Structure formats: C-alpha cells, structure tokens
C-alpha cells in the first residue's frame, strides 16, 4: 500500500483493476489521497490517468462494457459497493472536464442545475448559493450583472471557472479535474491554477495533467502512471527532485514519454 503521512486519507484505493471489455486498463492500483490536498496524476497518454479519475465517481458506468474491481474507500465507505447511490456519490465527488462544458442555459441556471437535484432551497437560499459558488470560482465579480446571459457567452477561461462553480455548488467533498487547463490560454491557465490553490482549503482535489510543470506548481502529491500501473507516488517535491524509480526519473526528465 502506498501510504500518506499520518493524515487520515480521504480516498483509499485498494487493489483496483479496471476493464474496457477484455482490455485490462488499470492493474492493482493501491493509493491513498489525503484530505484538503492536491494530488496530481501524470504519465503518457493512455496510461490510465483519466480512467482512474473516473472510478472515483463511477462516471464510467455511463458507458456499457466497462467494469471496476477492488475497493475505493471514501471516508471509509466503499463507493464501488452495489448499495451506493451513484447520484449522491457524484454530488459528493464533483468533476470538471478537459474542455469547458457549460450547459446551454443561463449562467444562473448552470449553477442551480445540480443543486436542484439534491436540495430543496428557497429562492433566496438558491440566490445565495449561486453567489457563493461563483465567488468560490473567483467569477462572481465578472458575471454578477449578467447572470441571465448564456454560459456560452463567456470566454474560455470564464467558462471553465463556471464549470468549477457548477461543480462546487452542490458542496462536494472531492473535486476531480481532468486536464482542466489544456484548452485554455496561459492567462486563463494561471487563473485556474491560482483557484486550485484556494479551493484546496475546502476540498480534496485530484487533477490529471499532461503538463508536468503544472503538476509541480499546483500539487502536494504526485502519482506517475504507466501502462495502467502506478509506478511511483509521493510528495511532489520528492517525485520531481529525487524520484525513487528510474522510470519516473526518465519521464520527469523527458527521456521518455
């Protein structure tokens, strides 16, 4: 088992295997993710990073022929169990994807969409929640006077922050970020990275990134994956300066991948 410090883990992955039909995509993954920290997953394309992320909220169940075996413990409860309400799980474990995906509706309705699925709030309470979520995503000051406008009217960076606001509006405990800045310009990327630092005060964050410099900047822990296996996991500073595995060093230094 790859363990953290004495801090109790928020997520604990136990002997996780994942299959796309007969293809064995994740192999015996064992990992602990600390609360209110940022854990980055790096590795070449196709190594299983995004697949692993999607097991944390069972997003893979939206597609036929995919299955996970093993255990993923969220606060001590196995989220792969048959008795788990997947919709409630996804409220606890929010996700932001590679490309900004605002719903084709107003900024306000983008934020309230998920909240309405899980909570019954008064109009005043909902307005407060919308402002709270947009402030969390550092977007309130930019959109407070145009909440009725389409989310698609925003710039790319603003759209991604809207998606983050939408994810936090349901008050999740974990945020999954799958390449959240790969489609953004450098200035928007810097805004998102700054936001990640702020959000980890309240959320456990797991981020997939192909940008190793980004992983070094934003994460507390880093996992290097290759061909569906977890090669090395540890403190980000250690992974990037004194990795224990030669395969990790080769990838970090650009000799491979």
From Swiss-Prot:
Gene Ontology process terms (BP): phosphate ion transmembrane transport
Membrane topology: Peripheral membrane protein
Keywords linked to the UniProt accession: ATP-binding, Cell inner membrane, Cell membrane, Membrane, Nucleotide-binding, Phosphate transport, Translocase, Transport
Record-linked InterPro entries: AAA+_ATPase (IPR003593), ABC_transporter-like_ATP-bd (IPR003439), ABC_transporter-like_CS (IPR017871), P-loop_NTPase (IPR027417), PstB-like (IPR005670)
Subcellular location: Cell inner membrane
GO MF: ATP binding; ATP hydrolysis activity; ATPase-coupled phosphate ion transmembrane transporter activity
GO cellular component entries: plasma membrane
Residues binding ATP, per UniProt: 43-50
SMART domains per record: AAA (SM00382)
EC number: 7.3.2.1
Family: Belongs to the ABC transporter superfamily. Phosphate importer (TC 3.A.1.7) family.
Job description of the protein: Part of the ABC transporter complex PstSACB involved in phosphate import. Responsible for energy coupling to the transport system.
Assembly notes: The complex is composed of two ATP-binding proteins (PstB), two transmembrane proteins (PstC and PstA) and a solute-binding protein (PstS).
NCBIfam families: 3a0107s01c2
Protein name: Phosphate import ATP-binding protein PstB
The species this protein was found in: Chromobacterium violaceum (strain ATCC 12472 / DSM 30191 / JCM 1249 / CCUG 213 / NBRC 12614 / NCIMB 9131 / NCTC 9757 / MK)
Lineage of source species: Bacteria, Pseudomonadati, Pseudomonadota, Betaproteobacteria, Neisseriales
Annotated gene: pstB
